[in-house]
Each structure stands twice: as C-alpha cells, then as structure tokens.
Amino acid sequence: MQKYLLFCLAFCVLGCLAQDLIVRPNDPIIYKKEGGAFLWLGDTAWELFHVLDKEEIVHYLDNRQEKGFTVIQAVILSELDGLDKPNAYGYLPLVDKDPTQITEGYFELMDFVIREAGKR
C-alpha cells in the first residue's frame, strides 16, 4: 500500500512540475512561473485513466477547459476492481497484481492524458 501511495504522490508532484508552478514557504498562494496566482479549480475524474478511451478523454478535457477548470484530479488505480478490470484498451495496470511490474500499455494512456492536458 505504501508503494501505491508513494507512486500516486510522485505522479501528483510531476503534474505540478509540468505546470511551472511556484510554492513559497509560509505562503498559502501557489504562483504561476510567468506571474500571477494559480487558482486550483479542480474537477474530480477519479476513473479517467481507467474508463475512457482517447477520444472521450480529449472531449472531456476540452469540456473542462471550456468551463474554466485548471486541475483534473484522477487516480492511477481505480478503487473498485482497479487491479482486475482492464482499461478501455484492455490493459490491466500491473502484471499479476505485482506493483513492481507495470503494464506499459496501461501507463502509456496516462502519458497521453498528461500530454493532452498540457495542450490546454
């Protein structure tokens, strides 16, 4: 469980780094590198990586951008049957439920989502 938590935390940190955000000690405001405050207006799409295909993901991200959301919150492993039920492309996240053996196809979709989100 600790490995999952650490992996999820690392994923969140990488997402923040991709945004070029600045966090200052003792300051509750997150800043954009180019200046100004960053408003964390998040939508929860917990099973985004697990349920949607690429076309649906692009549609979802476009819709969230139109509505002004700045953050999409999702989980890497679905809470309900996330290790046993494949994603939209038939990939399970782990080989034999072993957290040291990831399935590349499953995580390639996450790379796609991050790239697409970065375009918006």
Regions found by a protein language model. Give the residues of each.
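Sec-dependent N-terminal signal peptides
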Residues: 4-14
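Active-site-adjacent substrate/metal-binding segments within catalytic domains
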Residues: 20-120
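Boundary at the C-terminal end of the N-terminal hydrophobic targeting segment
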Residues: 16-18
